[in-house]
UniProtKB/Swiss-Prot annotation:
Protein name (Swiss-Prot/TrEMBL): Flagellar hook-basal body complex protein FliE
Pfam families, A to Z: FliE
Similarity-based family: Belongs to the FliE family.
Chief localization: other
PANTHER family per UniProt: FLAGELLAR HOOK-BASAL BODY COMPLEX PROTEIN FLIE, PTHR34653
HAMAP family per UniProt: FliE (MF_00724)
Origin species: Nitrosomonas europaea (strain ATCC 19718 / CIP 103999 / KCTC 2705 / NBRC 14298)
Keywords assigned by UniProt, alphabetized: Bacterial flagellum
Annotated compartments: Bacterial flagellum basal body
GO terms for MF: cytoskeletal motor activity; structural molecule activity
GO cellular component: bacterial-type flagellum basal body
GO BP, sorted A to Z: bacterial-type flagellum-dependent cell motility
Statement: the UniProt record of this protein carries the keyword ATP-binding: no
Disulfide bond annotation, renumbered to this chain: none
Length: 109
């Protein structure tokens, strides 16, 4: 599973939960297509993948700066951009989780 598909699944679950909280309607078909993996496991897996991408980018960068002739500049730049995009995506997921949590906490019982 790549970072994008994991985050898509998380966002689909968040949207379905938000729809349920807002309208009290039945879960959408999106929820049933999401794998039966635990939400916490999906989130942990996505965070681990982002961490791996960042570590790889950092390692390539260190090797390039250290003078390793096998590491090309374009490989370093691509790796750094992948790490940046995956980290920014994770930040957006975190922001949506916080917003969803705040909405749930503000609901009247």
């Amino acid at each position: 599973m790549n970072v994008t598909s994991g985050m898509d699944q998380i966002l689909a679950q968040l949207k379905a939960t938000s729809d349920l909280a807002a309208g009290g309607s039945k879960p959408s078909a999106t929820v049933s297509t999401v794998s039966q993996a635990d939400f916490g496991q999906l989130l942990k897996s996505a965070v681990d993948q982002v961490n791996t991408v960042q570590q790889t980018a950092s390692q390539l960068s260190r090797e390039f700066v250290g003078g390793n002739q096998d590491v090309e500049l374009h490989d370093v730049m691509i790796s750094l951009q992948k790490a940046n995009v995956s980290f920014q995506s994770m930040i957006q997921v975190r922001n949506r989780l916080v917003t969803a949590y705040q909405e749930i906490m503000n609901m009247q019982v």
